[in-house]
């Protein structure tokens, strides 16, 4: 299920939040793994074409850290971010802080990702809570949804491949 207005939804329920929802044709435990295992995260969390992820470190426990660094191969540009896990409720919910190395919005954000499965379809709901309306507005103007659409489309392909090969 590649991008369509029905499969990828973005909303702003408050002046400090962005909520992104997407359905995946895969069981929840597999989608959870794709969000939490570095060898799977590297295959899809890349944004637009031309980016790689040379650093993907995940210490999946409360108080554990994660670190991602992306590289745009054509320019050599790096973009890094990291945070700390506040809640890990396998396979239902992740809560973690988020801060970019070169912050393009003020402050730190808190990401809450919820995984809900119904009939073999897993809905992922990411709620990003920013420190201020200014930070939220900066994020909404950034075009971040384009990179997320590309990444989530890639994730759908990774999940389909794992199911097809029985590799999960």
What does each model-identified segment do?
Residues 28, 59-61, 86-93, 114-123:
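A short, structured loop/turn motif at beta-sheet edges
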